[in-house]
Structures are given as structure tokens and as C-alpha cells.
């Protein structure tokens, strides 16, 4: 934690009032914190603060105690309790040590990191920039505290969608830490985790996996397999494998992240919600819609309570629930979820963030399901423009946007506009995700349906067959997407008077849907 840097500053040993030592609870709190026992650390730091205040309200040790107590609160997800402590610590440190002291910078970094966690990005940035300027001037450009502030600023820029800036800072922080601290230091793992999170967003999957696995190994070795610090790389690995279509591999790290979070931090902690959100997305992709909704609703409740109703993480969960509702053909539920997510994101992230594009795509899906084509088209087009600009023209998210827009055009009989969009979506998916990815299969189904609408039956049939092969392999034979493809293929067979085969396909689709609707045993 950034705030722990406060505790590293040398303080002359001096017995507190009544012969009680301030250093004793500080050291005990530091040990508990490093071991991930944050509630215990909180109690020790509170005791240290009480003893420090006996030395005088403006004593630098009061600022140190406040900073560490705030770090414990933040680790516990109690952001509202942490902020006033850090602001008081900053006032004391500036008054006692001057505005350019490293302890002032450490407190500024802690405040900035807290602001980022709270979704208050505009407030966080100037704090972090001031901290970085102090650290570089006073400590030198290769000091570990410079790396800590660089990492905090990179995390903020990543959350804001400023990926180029974030990468430069993350790489610099990693280089400093590896040089000064060694490759197996836990602070190196923090830089690795931040860089892995960035690369996952950019679909740089090979680099993401290497960095996340290395971060996890460092933290497991240094801290143990059940320390809260292992949660973040596990969540990244779960997200990564899910996006790659490696669903069995995705579930294990995501479930482990949830178990660690619930045990170490409690079931209502934001870290638990992050793991739940990954599991909800995984269940949604695998066609386990009831499970996905339960997980998503639980994540939403945690995030709304812990972070507030307008936090960007709340919007992320809302967007996932909107996507789920659209998959279940529940447009009336999907649209308000997508609109609420979009409103939060435009307010907190700006109008051109990739998360805004995701909510726009979900909104477009809801509108398309309601035959509100004139409203859906600008939503899809805006999502595509954002993703191309912020993520690049070959991002898998761009492929999703293209496919959605292509389907809208197909439903409007705008076939000449639809086909190149599908073709481009397919090419992106095959290149970035691989030719057997479920997203590629879904695009092939849509392309086949386009050909069917144009009576290009000889071209459509092998595409349906190919897509079904891919979907059964990747998703399993009983997935709702398989049922949908069977129904589309059956419609083609009817059009070419192969009624018996069509009936067989429809029967298979009905069996899948009946099985999915049956209560779990």
C-alpha cells in the first residue's frame, strides 16, 4: 500500500505519555498489514494514533499513524473512513515538514490512489502529479517511492482509458523496481499486475498472461497463497481466459479469487465483487443465465453499498446485466440497465471511454430487440467509433461492434452494407481470438443468415454447419447459442424444402431450450 511508505520514514524513538511506546503498536500494525490481516492492523494503528496524539496534535507521528490507519481502512474497502484521515495527515505533514517533504508526497499518493478507487478521477490526478514532482525532485528519478507514485498514476490513467500514458508510466515503474528492489520483490508484483490489467484491456493476451502469472508467483511466494494481494492477478487471469474462450481455465482463478476475498476481506468487499463480476460474465458466456444473474446482482449490491450508486464499477456490473438481459430477449429490462450504466460512465469517464462503448452496444441490442432500429443505429455507430479510436481497429470489441451493426443492417434488408461488416468482424476475430473462438462462430452464423436472407442458400448452409461445429466444441452441445444456430439452420432447410431435416434441427433446439429452462438439480 502507498500509505505504508509513511511508516518507512525514520522517527526518533521517544516514549509516549504514561510510558507507553508509540512504536510498539505501529510495528505490530505493520506486521498485521503486511500479512493481510487488515482488521487487526486497523486496531493497532488506532492505538498508535491515540498514543501519538498525546505527543501533540501536530506531531509528525500523528501524521504517520493517520496514514497507516487510512491504509488499513482502504484495504478493508472503507474508503469514506480513510479519506478524512489522509487529509488530516497531509495538513500535519505539510505544517511540520514543509510542502516538499517525501512524507507529504507519500500522503498525496495515498490520497490520489484512494480517489481513483472511489472513482473520483479528476480529483485524484493533480494529487498524484504533485506527489510525483516532489518525489523526483527530492528523492531522484529512480527511487522506489517514485515507482510507487508512477504506478498509482498509471492505474488512474488506465481507468480513464488513457492507455498509452498508462503503459509508459507502468513500464518505468517496473524498470525502477526491478533495478532497485530485485525481480522477486512484492512491489515488482504490483507493477506487473497493473501492466497485465492494461494489456488485457488492449487484447494483448500473451503478454497479459506472462505478467499476471509472474505477479501471482511472486506474491504467492512472498505473502502466501491466501493473501489478499493474490486476488488481483487471479481476477486478471480469469478475465483473460474467459475472453480467449478458455472457459474451464477461467473459472478456477476466478473462484479462487472469490474464496480468498471472502475469507480475508469479507463477502461484502469490493474485491469480492470484482471476482463475482468475472464469474457472472463467465456464466453468461457459457449460457448459464440464471447463475449469471444471481452473481451479477450480488456484485451490484456489494458495489452500490461499498462504492456508491454512481461509481464506474457499478456501471460495469450494470452493463453486464444489460447484456445478459438482451441475451435472454428481455429488452424491457436490458434498456434501463444499459441507460443507467451509460449515464454513470459518461459522467465519470467522459464520452469516449471504451466502457461507454460497451454500454452503448448493450443499449443498441436492447433497442434492436424492440425493433427500434433508428435508435439502435447511432448507438452502435458511436460504440464502433469509440472502440476503433481507443482500442484500435483490430480489437475484439471492434469486431463485436461490427457484428452488431451488421445484424441491424441485415434486419433492415440493407444487405450490401451488412456483408463487409460481418466479413471484417470475422477477420478480426480469427486473427486476434483464433478461428475456433465462440465470437467467431457467432459472426459466421450471422453471415450465414445474411446469405439465407438473400437466397444464397448454397453459401449459407456450410457456414451454419461450420458454426455449429465450432459452437458445440467451444460451448458444449447444450448451449443456448447452439439452439439459436440450429433454429437458423432449420429455417434455411425449410426454405429449400428439406422439411424432415428442418424438423430434426428444431427438435434439437427445443430439447436444448427445455433443458436450459429446467430447474437445476
Which residues fall in each region the model found?
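Intrinsic-disorder-linked linear interaction elements in eukaryotic regulatory proteins
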Residues: 1-521
Amino acid at each position: 500500500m502507498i500509505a505504508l511508505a509513511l511508516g518507512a520514514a525514520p522517527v526518533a524513538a521517544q516514549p509516549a505519555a504514561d510510558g507507553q511506546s508509540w512504536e510498539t503498536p505501529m510495528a505490530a500494525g505493520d506486521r498485521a498489514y503486511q500479512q493481510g490481516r487488515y482488521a487487526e492492523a486497523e486496531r493497532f494503528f488506532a492505538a498508535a494514533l491515540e498514543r501519538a496524539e498525546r505527543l501533540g496534535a501536530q506531531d509528525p507521528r500523528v501524521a504517520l499513524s493517520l496514514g497507516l490507519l487510512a491504509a488499513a481502512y482502504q484495504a478493508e474497502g472503507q474508503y469514506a473512513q480513510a479519506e478524512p484521515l489522509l487529509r488530516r495527515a497531509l495538513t500535519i505533514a505539510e505544517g511540520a515538514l514543509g510542502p516538499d517533504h517525501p512524507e507529504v508526497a507519500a500522503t498525496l499518493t495515498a490520497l490520489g490512489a484512494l480517489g481513483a478507487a472511489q472513482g473520483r478521477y479528476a480529483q485524484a490526478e493533480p494529487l498524484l502529479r504533485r506527489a510525483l514532482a516532489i518525489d523526483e525532485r527530492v528523492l531522484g528519478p529512480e527511487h522506489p517511492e517514485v515507482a510507487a507514485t508512477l504506478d498509482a498514476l498509471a492505474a488512474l490513467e488506465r481507468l480513464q482509458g488513457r492507455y498509452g500514458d498508462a503503459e509508459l508510466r507502468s513500464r518505468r515503474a517496473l524498470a525502477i523496481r526491478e533495478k532497485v528492489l530485485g525481480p522477486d520483490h512484492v512491489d515488482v508484483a504490483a507493477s506487473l499486475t497493473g501492466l497485465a490489467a492494461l494489456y488485457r484491456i488492449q487484447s494483448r493476451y500473451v503478454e497479459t498472461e506472462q505478467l499476471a502469472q509472474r505477479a501471482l508467483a511472486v506474491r504467492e511466494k512472498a505473502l502466501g497463497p491466501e493473501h489478499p494481494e493474490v486476488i488481483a492477478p487471479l481476477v486478471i487471469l480469469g478475465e483473460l481466459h474467459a475472453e480467449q474462450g478458455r472457459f474451464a481455465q477461467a473459472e478456477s482463478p476466478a473462484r479462487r479469487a472469490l474464496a480468498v476475498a471472502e475469507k480475508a476481506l469479507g463477502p461484502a468487499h469490493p474485491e469480492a465483487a470484482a471476482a463475482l463480476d468475472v464469474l457472472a460474465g463467465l456464466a453468461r458466456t457459457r449460457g448459464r443465465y440464471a447463475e449469471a444473474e444471481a452473481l451479477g446482482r450480488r456484485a451490484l449490491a456489494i458495489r452500490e453499498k461499498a462504492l456508491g450508486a454512481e461509481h464506474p464499477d457499478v456501471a460495469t456490473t450494470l452493463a453486464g446485466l444489460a447484456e445478459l438481459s438482451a441475451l435472454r430477449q428481455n429488452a424491457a429490462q436490458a434498456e434501463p440497465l444499459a441507460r443507467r450504466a451509460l449515464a454513470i460512465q459518461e459522467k465519470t469517464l467522459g464520452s469516449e471511454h471504451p466502457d461507454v462503448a460497451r454500454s452503448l452496444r448493450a443499449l443498441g441490442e436492447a433497442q434492436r430487440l424492440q425493433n427500434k432500429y433508428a435508435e439502435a443505429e447511432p448507438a452502435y455507430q458511436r460504440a464502433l467509433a469509440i472502440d476503433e479510436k481507443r482500442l484500435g481497429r483490430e480489437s475484439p470489441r471492434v469486431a463485436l461492434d461490427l457484428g452488431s451493426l451488421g445484424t441491424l443492417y441485415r434486419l433492415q434488408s440493407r444487405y450490401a452494407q451488412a456483408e463487409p461488416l460481418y466479413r471484417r468482424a470475422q477477420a478480426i476475430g480469427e486473427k486476434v481470438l483464433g478461428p475456433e473462438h465462440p465470437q467467431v462462430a457467432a459472426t459466421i452464423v450471422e453471415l450465414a443468415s445474411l446469405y439465407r436472407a438473400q437466397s444464397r442458400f448454397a453459401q449459407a448452409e456450410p457456414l451454419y454447419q461450420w458454426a455449429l461445429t465450432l459452437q458445440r466444441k467451444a460451448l458444449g452441445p447444450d448451449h443456448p447459442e447452439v439452439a439459436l444456430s440450429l433454429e437458423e439452420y432449420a429455417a434455411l432447410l425449410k426454405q429449400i424444402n428439406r422439411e424432415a431435416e428442418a424438423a430434426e434441427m428444431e427438435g434439437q433446439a427445443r430439447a436444448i431450450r427445455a433443458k436450459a429452462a429446467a430447474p437445476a438439480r
